[in-house]
């Protein structure tokens, strides 16, 4: 019997812009009749997976594209030789001013610094829930789809596996943006986000599920994804951009770390490391020297990197916005100083540049971790990518937190470092030093991949080894003459409510959801950097 699939709100917008096949062209924008698993496969591609879009202005309020500008690895560019060019002012207006509310942890994250206007804060929330709802529809409809041949049965399993994986990844993002970090002591009462698993419109008002309920659903989805995608493995041509059993295991390992379930985190990391389809990038990839005329051969995270297990969505840091110049974002000097001189990531990931007029820049650029090009549509996203190095880091952390497994933790840590640091000699750590070294390595390896913010949150509630710190962001504001007007210093203290985002105001008003406390934030310091006679 034919069934109508109502892809509430999202399908019309997404399917009509995706070339998925004739099936999608035969039906109206808001109603689709599916009769085969292949139809649902097309819907999965068009309305569940995230597209890769070239973000000219870098970080965005969509798709959680702001994650890499709110942690302690980023700041804003400053040059003591600021020129008289007005380009920096134009850059500031385009890149930084509109994301001020996120960068400075404001009550109204959509606030534009220069204009004072406030944009909607619901783009990420709304998009993720639309994609989740489309997953719910697909999982509901696929039960009745014919799968009486080997080919159809394989697709039947695979589509379900991918759908469960995607729902888990999106709920994990929502939970960590709009809920507190998972705390085993309080997870049964801490409010998280609404948990919607049905394909139809609910008649009752939504309420916020508890952190434990949401994480239980995430784990359940990932276990199902692992099972289905083991029964029907992802073909090699699709592995990078479609979920696989290895991707499910790696994400599940991360989820267990968040839950402080060290034993299960280790098991899932081991499963990834044992896979014949997973390998670490060798030191040779980092040893390739940048070519001034063709950077492609020197970039680390590209489609050619064998570490990439899964990637979707856009790259919000690959353009010119992280070049460290006046009016742009820069890499925090503190992060740069963590790398030893023989660590090849130091010279590959980062570099000092010059202004457009070749005057020196005092700030660091994010160089060749990704391919950096203006208006570039990267094939490797900066938020939702999963890669092999994380499995080694997850294994090291999980073992470091367990009694009697310090040697295993060191083994995983040393193997990763041998593929990153020239002439590296294996190290043996114990106790607190081991945990600190694992966390240090995680920061150095996974910087600007959308993980540091969540790591800082979970370290603060770690029962075995809590860690908290103050984050300082300096907002350098240029003038229209290219010099600086002011420098504003903002601090995010430990346990600050801003570690949890406010429920979007439109959603809050409609569903009457319990609020997340968040407060207005003023700079702790304001000073004039450079003031010319003309100013």
Give the ranges of each region predicted by the language model.
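Sec-dependent bacterial lipoprotein signal peptides
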Residues: 1-18
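Membrane-proximal, proline-rich intrinsically disordered regions
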Residues: 20-80, 269, 335, 339, ...
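Extended ligand-binding clefts on enzyme/binding-domain cores
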Residues: 41-66, 70, 209, 213, ...
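Conserved, well-structured interaction surfaces
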Residues: 94-178, 209, 227-230, 378-386, ...
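Inward-facing hydrophobic residues that define packing positions of alpha-helical scaffold repeats
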Residues: 132-135, 215, 222, 269, ...
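Short coil/linker segments at helix-helix boundaries
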Residues: 154, 177-216
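TPR-repeat structural position
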Residues: 215, 262, 405-406
């Amino acid at each position: 019997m034919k069934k109508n699939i109502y892809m509430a709100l999202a399908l019309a917008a997404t399917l009509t812009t995706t070339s998925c096949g004739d099936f999608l062209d035969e039906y109206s924008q808001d109603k689709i009749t599916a009769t085969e698993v292949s139809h649902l496969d097309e819907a999965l591609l068009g309305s569940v997976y995230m597209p890769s879009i070239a973000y000219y202005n870098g970080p965005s309020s969509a798709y959680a594209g702001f994650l890499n500008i709110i942690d302690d690895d980023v700041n804003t560019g400053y040059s003591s030789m600021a020129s008289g060019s007005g380009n920096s002012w134009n850059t500031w207006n385009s890149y930084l001013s509109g994301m001020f509310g996120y960068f400075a942890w404001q009550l109204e994250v959509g606030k534009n610094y220069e204009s004072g206007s406030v944009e909607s804060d619901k783009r990420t929330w709304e998009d993720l829930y639309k994609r989740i709802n489309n997953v719910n529809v697909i999982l509901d409809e696929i039960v009745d789809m014919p799968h009486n041949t080997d080919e159809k049965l394989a697709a039947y399993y695979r589509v379900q596996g991918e759908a469960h994986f995607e729902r888990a990844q999106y709920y994990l993002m929502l939970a960590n943006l709009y809920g507190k970090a998972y705390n085993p002591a309080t997870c049964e009462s801490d409010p998280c986000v609404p948990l919607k698993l049905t394909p139809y419109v609910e008649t009752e008002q939504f309420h916020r599920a508890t952190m434990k309920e949401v994480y239980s659903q995430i784990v359940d989805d990932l276990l199902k994804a692992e099972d289905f995608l083991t029964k029907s493995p992802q073909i090699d041509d699709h592995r990078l951009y479609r979920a696989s059993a290895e991707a499910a295991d790696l994400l599940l390992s991360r989820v267990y770390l968040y839950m402080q379930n060290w034993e299960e985190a280790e098991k899932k990391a081991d499963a990834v490391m044992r896979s014949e389809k997973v390998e670490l990038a060798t030191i040779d990839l980092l040893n390739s020297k940048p070519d001034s005329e063709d950077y492609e051969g020197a970039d680390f995270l590209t489609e050619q990197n064998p570490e990439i297990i899964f990637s979707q969505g856009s790259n919000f840091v690959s353009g010119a916005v992280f070049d460290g110049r006046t009016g742009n974002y820069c890499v925090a000097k503190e992060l740069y100083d963590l790398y030893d001189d023989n660590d090849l990531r130091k010279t590959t990931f980062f570099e000092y540049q010059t202004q457009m007029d070749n005057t020196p820049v005092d700030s660091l650029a994010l160089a060749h971790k990704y391919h950096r090009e203006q208006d570039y549509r990267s094939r490797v996203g900066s938020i939702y990518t999963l890669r092999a190095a994380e499995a080694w880091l997850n294994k090291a952390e999980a073992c470091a937190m367990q009694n009697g497994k310090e040697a295993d933790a060191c083994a995983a840590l040393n193997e990763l470092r041998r593929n990153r640091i020239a002439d590296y000699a294996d190290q043996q750590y114990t106790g607190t030093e081991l945990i600190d070294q694992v966390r240090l390595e995680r920061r150095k390896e996974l910087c600007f991949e959308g993980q540091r913010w969540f790591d800082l949150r979970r370290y603060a509630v770690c029962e075995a080894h809590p860690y908290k710190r103050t984050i300082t962001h300096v907002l350098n504001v240029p003038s229209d003459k290219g010099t600086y007007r002011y420098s504003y210093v903002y601090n995010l203290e430990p346990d600050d409510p801003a570690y949890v985002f406010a429920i979007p105001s439109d959603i809050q008003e409609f569903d009457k959801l319990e609020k997340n406390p968040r407060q207005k934030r003023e700079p702790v310091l304001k000073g004039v950097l450079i003031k010319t006679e003309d100013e």
